[in-house]
C-alpha cells in the first residue's frame, strides 16, 4: 500500500493531486477533510481526526473500502478491526458522544453554508489573500513553490528574525493568536481551517 498526507501542517506543504498508483491508497486527511469536495472512491482508506474541521479531538472519521476491510487480520482484538466497527454501526464500544453531537452540528453548518464547494472557494480565497500579501511584502517570505503551498496552513518567515517577538506581540494585541510556527521549523504559521473567518 501507499500512505500519504495531502497536507503537511508544520511546513505548509500540500499535494493537490491524488496519486494514481496500482497499490491500495491510504491517506491521513485530518487537516483537509471537509475543506473541499473529495472523490473517496479513489482511496482504499481515509482517516481523519476531527480536531481541525469537524469538532473536538477524540473523534476519528474512517472511510474504508469493503475490499480492504474484508482483508483485516481476524486474530486482532475486535476493537482493532474496522469490520467489527462497521458491523456494529460504529457502536462497538461507547462512542465519544459529545464529539459526535458536536460533529453533527458542524456537518449541518457546512451544509447550510453552501457545502464543500463553498468551503473550497472560501479557503482558496483566504489562502490567496495571505500568500499575495506575503509575496508582495518586503517584511515576510514564503519559500515554498506555489504549486506545493497549503491552502490550510500558510507558513511564512519574517526576513529579519529579530522582529519575531514584536510581530507575535502586535499580532496578539490585534486578536491574531497562535501564529508562532511549529517548534521544529520556527517561523510563523496561520492555520485557516473552515471555521476561520475571511
Regions found by a protein language model. Give the residues of each.
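Solvent-exposed alpha-helices and their adjacent loops that cap or buttress functional pockets
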Residues: 17-20, 37-41, 52-56, 146-147, ...
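Conserved hydrophobic/aromatic beta-strand scaffold that supports enzyme active sites
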Residues: 1, 45, 59-63, 153-155
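Short acidic/polar capping segments at secondary-structure boundaries
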Residues: 6-11, 30-33, 38, 51-54, ...
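Active-site C-terminal subdomain of aminotransferase-like
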Residues: 50-131, 145
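Active-site phosphate-binding strand-loop segment of PLP-dependent enzymes
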Residues: 1-33
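Conserved PLP-binding active-site segment of the aspartate aminotransferase-like
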Residues: 154-160, 176-198
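Conserved active-site segment immediately N-terminal to the catalytic lysine
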Residues: 26, 40-51
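Conserved PLP-binding catalytic core of the aspartate aminotransferase-like
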Residues: 140-171
Amino acid at each position: 500500500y501507499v500512505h500519504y498526507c495531502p497536507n503537511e501542517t508544520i511546513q505548509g506543504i500540500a499535494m493537490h493531486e491524488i496519486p494514481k498508483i496500482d497499490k491500495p491508497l491510504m491517506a491521513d486527511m485530518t487537516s483537509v477533510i471537509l475543506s473541499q469536495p473529495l472523490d473517496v472512491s479513489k482511496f482504499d482508506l481515509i482517516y481523519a481526526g476531527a480536531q481541525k474541521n469537524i469538532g473536538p479531538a477524540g473523534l476519528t472519521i474512517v472511510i474504508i473500502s469493503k475490499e480492504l476491510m474484508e482483508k483485516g487480520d481476524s486474530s486482532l482484538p475486535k476493537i482493532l478491526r474496522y469490520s467489527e466497527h462497521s458491523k456494529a454501526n460504529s457502536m462497538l464500544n461507547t462512542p465519544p458522544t459529545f464529539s459526535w453531537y458536536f460533529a453533527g452540528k458542524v456537518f449541518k453548518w457546512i451544509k447550510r453554508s453552501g457545502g464543500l464547494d463553498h468551503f473550497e472557494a472560501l479557503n482558496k480565497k483566504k489562502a490567496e489573500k495571505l500568500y499575495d500579501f506575503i509575496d508582495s511584502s518586503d517584511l515576510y517570505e514564503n519559500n515554498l513553490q506555489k504549486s506545493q503551498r497549503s491552502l490550510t496552513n500558510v507558513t511564512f518567515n519574517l526576513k529579519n528574525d529579530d522582529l519575531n517577538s514584536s510581530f507575535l506581540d502586535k499580532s496578539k494585541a490585534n486578536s491574531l493568536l497562535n501564529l508562532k510556527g511549529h517548534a521544529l521549523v520556527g517561523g510563523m504559521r496561520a492555520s485557516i481551517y473552515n471555521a476561520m473567518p475571511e
